[in-house]
């Protein structure tokens, strides 16, 4: 399901949960009754992957880069990186692909010079002769993956939410403890080599957080980012967008 329609799908009752925290928080700020109940990562593994001919940031001027879309996490991270390396985004072309898999496909087919990717697509690209040019996922406070639920779901089906959270936390524990099996599953799921799956495993496990909570700094930082593009009340409490009462230790 396209990330952009997930908030409406959850309100309509077509799904019970979805994983994109940035999408969920953005929708909640816009007025939808959604809440973050679980966060997986300390930072996000977004990587700018390019052709081998790119040796310095300025080499990207006049080239095209694939991203999921405007105002998506890859877009925000890339804008922050451009600012860091002092490149104007107007000097670089963008291809909006609708998703990471499609961004990878655009890079692999040489429609673009670079793409903002996450594992396993960045590792898959490296195998095909591209290179990881820059980690961009640590430049902006943007929450990534976890669990978004509707407030109605939390209020009326708390047991289902609790069981889903517990199952996901158990899965993370299992992944940490079972490297060989996890790597094999990643390779089978994404049709990648064992070496690619190993690198993907290492990246994700290194970025898992320890308690399932979203740091207040990240939530506040993301609200500040949203304020750059639309009105967001200055007194909006970011902690009202989360409910971690069902995690171990409660609130």
Give the role of each language-model region:
Residues 9, 13, 51, 63, ...:
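Structured segments of extracytoplasmic/periplasmic soluble domains
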Residues 23, 94-95, 101-189:
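Pocket-lining segment of extracytoplasmic ligand-binding domains
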Residues 155-233:
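Secondary-structure end/capping motifs
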Residues 227-251:
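Conserved C-terminal helix/tail region of periplasmic/extracytoplasmic solute-binding proteins
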């Amino acid at each position: 399901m396209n990330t952009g329609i997930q908030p409406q799908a959850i309100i309509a009752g077509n799904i019970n949960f979805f994983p994109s925290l940035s999408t969920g928080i953005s929708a909640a700020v816009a007025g939808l009754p959604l809440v973050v109940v679980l966060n997986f990562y300390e930072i996000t593994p977004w990587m700018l992957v390019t052709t081998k001919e790119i040796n310095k940031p300025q080499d990207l001027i006049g080239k095209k880069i694939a991203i999921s879309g405007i105002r998506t996490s890859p877009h925000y991270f890339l804008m922050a990186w451009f600012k860091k390396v002092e490149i104007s985004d107007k000097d670089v072309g963008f291809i909006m692909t609708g998703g990471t898999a499609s961004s990878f496909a655009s890079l692999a087919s040489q429609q673009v010079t670079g793409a903002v990717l996450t594992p396993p697509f960045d590792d898959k690209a490296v195998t095909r002769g591209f290179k990881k040019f820059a980690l961009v996922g640590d430049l902006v406070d943007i929450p990534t993956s976890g669990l978004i639920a509707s407030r109605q779901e939390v209020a009326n089906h708390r047991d289902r939410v609790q069981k889903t959270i517990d199952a996901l936390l158990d899965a993370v524990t299992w992944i940490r403890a079972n490297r060989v099996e996890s790597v094999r599953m990643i390779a089978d799921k994404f049709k990648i080599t064992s070496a690619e799956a190993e690198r993907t495993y290492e990246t994700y496990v290194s970025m898992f957080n320890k308690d399932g909570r979203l740091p207040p700094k990240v939530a506040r930082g993301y609200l500040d980012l949203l304020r750059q593009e639309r009105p967001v009340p200055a007194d909006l409490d970011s902690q009202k967008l989360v409910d971690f009462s069902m995690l171990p230790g409660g609130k």
